[in-house]
Amino acid sequence: MKALRVFLLAIALMMASGAMAQTVRNSSGSSCGQIESNGTIRNSSGSSVGRFDSDGTIRNSSGSSIGKIDSDGTIRNSSGSSIGKVESDGTVRNSSGSSIGKVESDGTVRNSSGSSIGKAEGIKREWAAAYFFFFPFY
């Protein structure tokens, strides 16, 4: 019975540590940082460089608001002006409505030409779009 408890505890710890942060990769597959499930954004050295709050606020490393993601996918700058939008299919548009890329369901991030510019697997599409297109933390 004790061995079973230890085994279950080990599995729970492995699952919890895997769910804590997802690696963000550039087009060559190299890690350019991590986004934790609580929204903390870390650079490739592991230092906190910002965060996505649960209300959509995007903060820099000093905690100042630098933008916001609305519930409809609109991305705003610190002044509240719309700078883009993430549509439900992952298409990313700039403030004029032109497509500038896409975040696919598997986390692949593509530019407007369809070329892969990175990977953000297991991360909210809106967070990935903000990270790669509007607020480059890497």
Predicted regions and their residues:
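Long terminal segments
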Residues: K2-S48, S54-S65, S71-I83, S88-Y138
